[in-house]
Amino acid sequence: MWKTKLDETSHETPVTQQNDADLISAEDEERILFGKKDEHTEKMLKLKLSIHHSLLDRLNLAMLEQTPTEQIKAQISSILPELLADFDEPLNREEREKLVQELVDELMGLGPLEPLLADETITDILVNGPETVFVEKRGMLQPVPTRFQDEKHLMRVIQKIVSAVGRRVDESSPFVDARLADGSRVNAIVAPLALDGSLVSIRKFAKSPISIAKMIDLGSVPEQMAPVFEAIVKSRRNVLISGGTGSGKTTLLNAMSSYIDEAERIVTIEDSAELQLQQAHVARLETRPANIEGKGEVTQRDLVKNALRMRPDRIIVGEVRAGEAFDMLQAMNTGHDGSMTTVHANTPRDALSRVEQMIGMSGIDITSKSARAQIASAINVVVQVGRLSDGRRKIKSLSEITGMEGETITMQEIFRFRMTGRADDGSVLGHFEATGIRPKFLDEAESHGMHLSPELFRPDMKLG
């Protein structure tokens, strides 16, 4: 199988170096945003395409997988002068090195995407046709000068991605989800659904999980809240993490899971494996889409039901989207305390409404009042996460479900983030604060040896 990343030597070439403060030049930004093309860039793209075709004829493609990258570079470098004979512009040393690296990327990896995949500061790569690429860096989207020769070039890269995982994408099956060898998630959609060129969205997979300590360093979580999260997990409260797309739900879920005891058996269930639990006893399950004939699908609901037969101490579902929410609540209510999941919602109250809707999708004949009672008895804590306008991800609130009043689920907010203004550089100013409510889970935390200072919950207490 081909790999999506080269060895560490590939990071040393000039093409992969980006300045954090200024990802692209003003000229590149003008070209990207207004369609202006640089003549030299056009020539280099055509040259690379021509040489790439020549290399396909000359190199032993069957042996490339077993050949070290440096050896491939040497082979390309040795025949490059001959291949450049008809090129009317001489290349300097830096341009030659860059060209060799790009040719290696074409042969062994994902072509123009390789430098972006190698850049650890980039979290998302968004390809809008062959000539427009955006990345997310430090929480903000920005254009990059990366481009493909044409739509055919982009489609070759897409086919390389999907064929490696036994999938296909074409006019009859115009969108697909896949995963790169490093775990990064990929969604591709092509014509006729994509009107202006094929679209690729890559959510990069973190090499190492982000811990609560790292989230504190990033300002996502105030230091004083770390023991609160620890108490919630160790006292086996069932947790629902709510937030929008890209708000950091899975990141927080992964970080909170680090407080689970090593002796516990954890079963994780995901549509696309992202969780990186560090405990020794973790059973990881992943859904399977239907094949080309529409058969063989295994859903999250199937896996949640099966997980109950696997003697789990806790069940962690990466994200509930449909009828599996009912089975997850059943698990939380039947001895699997301390289970956790996430949901797409903009507020804690919306999160509970979404879960109620999902129960309705399960096909179970249940009244709204009964569904809400299930939710109120199963979920103990709702953590709301979000992305601020400056791109930073924050814990926005921590709430506790307290029961039912009539047909309404009752909930109390324990902590919240309060925005107070903006700095000169546009960054959001604010602080976390306690609401003055003493959470009910403190008693359970005490019984598990977790002692949280009452000062932490004073109404005038500002956290971070």
What is the meaning of each model-derived region?
Residues 206-217, 254, 258-305, 329, ...:
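P-loop NTPase switch/communication element
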Residues 119, 127, 132-235, 453:
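P-loop NTP-binding catalytic core
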Residues 269-283, 307-406:
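Conserved P-loop NTPase nucleotide-binding/switch module
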Residues 241:
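Hydrophobic anchor at the beta1->P-loop junction of P-loop NTPases
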Residues 249:
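Conserved lysine of the Walker
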Residues 1-142:
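N-terminal anchoring/assembly modules that precede and organize ATP-driven motor systems
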Residues 391-464:
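NTP-binding/hydrolysis catalytic cores, primarily Walker-type P-loop NTPases
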Residues 63-66, 86-93, 108-119, 161-178, ...:
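Active-site phosphate-binding and catalytic loops of NTP-dependent enzymes
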